[in-house]
Amino acid sequence: MIIRNKNNSFTLLFAWYGTILPTVLPALAIVVFLSTVLVYLSSQHFFQAPSVPAIGFTIFGIILSIFLSFRNTACYERWWEGRKLWGTLIATSRHISRDSHVLSEHHRQVLMYRVMLFSNLLRDRLRNQNQPIEFYENKVQLTTNDYQALFQHINASQYILESIQKDLVIALKTGEISDIIYQGLNQHIVELGNVQAGCDRILSTPLPFSYSVLLHRTVYCFCFILPFSLEASLGIWTPILVGLIAYLFLGLDALSEQLEEPFG
């Protein structure tokens, strides 16, 4: 996450890193270039651009804005739910850290390192990546067979939760913890499982592909045809206004694609 000072409006106006502009700049440059060429050819009487009725573009733009707002709302809800789930993961990990002081210091350290390993494995699962976990090898107290099973497991983060659950059961049977303490710690483990299930649901249920493609194509068609509608009335101001309108629509389209994947 990029943290910036939002109190400085001037700096925010000219921000580049972390904005949507680098993503849409190629398409935006093509639209502005097309508008400039169109204005130049028309002013030199080399070419008379076909006039597209503005009322048609007005209605088209309103409809397109409504559908873009629907898509952006749906994508933002996915992003916000992902943030809430990860916040729940952080809060639950802190609860485990606080409530696990009833365990011996060694068992508590193993438990907390496994919770940390679970978070890292879940992150890698959601981002479809594999980061090295050598840091945890001597800290999570897994046997060689357990490590082999971990790397071969289709859901490594779930495997870690199962190992935590088994250790808590052993601690209960040996009398290290009471059944009340076990239930409290187990509830936190259940909450971690719920977080993973929620993240998996978001990851495996994207917005309908056909819906995204339809809006994507419509936005680009609208932006590339727009100069033909505005050139007759705006003249040399056409590239500027077309660039601003295209930046708005192309930016909203690209922004919704980023929000659709809340896990980076």
Q: Could you say what each language-model-derived stretch is?
A:
Residues 48, 79-80, 148-155, 244:
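A ubiquitous short alpha-helical element
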Residues 89, 122, 259:
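A residue-level signal for conserved active-site and pocket-lining positions in enzyme catalytic cores
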